[in-house]
Amino acid sequence: PPGCKLMEWGHRLSFAYLSRWEGEEDALSALAEHLIQTGGLLCSSCQVIFLDTDALGEGDAFCRSFVPLLERATDRFRAALGEKGEGSLYAWETRLEHAADRLPGTLFPGRGCSLTLREDRELELSPLHGNVLVKCLPQKALLPVLRRQKGRLQTAGLLCPAQDRPALTQLLARAGVTRIAPPGSMSRTLSGEGHDGEFPLRRYVRTVDIQEPSPDRPI
């Protein structure tokens, strides 16, 4: 109908950006739990783990150390038989696609989960249910890469030294990210927070200003 406002929100992409990960087992465990609990199904779910490096060797070492954390999260949070089966199905499908050379990258398989280290730097969807892409993305390339997805970005899970956080937060905001949180809190919501960068109800509420007459000024 004329004058009817439409809901304009669509699918969004979220990711984790790690500029430091050695010695951060608690934060990485929280990220692994987020990946398993959300299964990559939410707009705020991490689709790609970006590492602040351009060395694939560092990406390889990260994947080898992170797979056990994913397996531990899988054992903890997939209690139902259906959940275990779904995660295992996606993991085996990913493994078969790699075996048939249909998917690029190096596969790091785990129990009901997997990591795939890719050489490109693009933000894209992961295979879901604990099967996640890992890519190297140094800070100098972060802005142009993310701006290619501007308008589709939502949450960034940021893990970095405290002194680097203000600069990285500003950089992510400039790229178009609308929510920045610790990696394990990417899908946690806060009362009154915005959605995709705005307070949605303001678009569907009409503001009426009313001024009451006062005794000394009736008109």
Walk through the language-model features, giving the residues of each:
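Glycine-rich beta-alpha junction loops
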Residues: 11-15, 22, 48-55, 161-162
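NAD(P)-dependent aldehyde/semialdehyde dehydrogenase
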Residues: 29, 37-157, 166-216
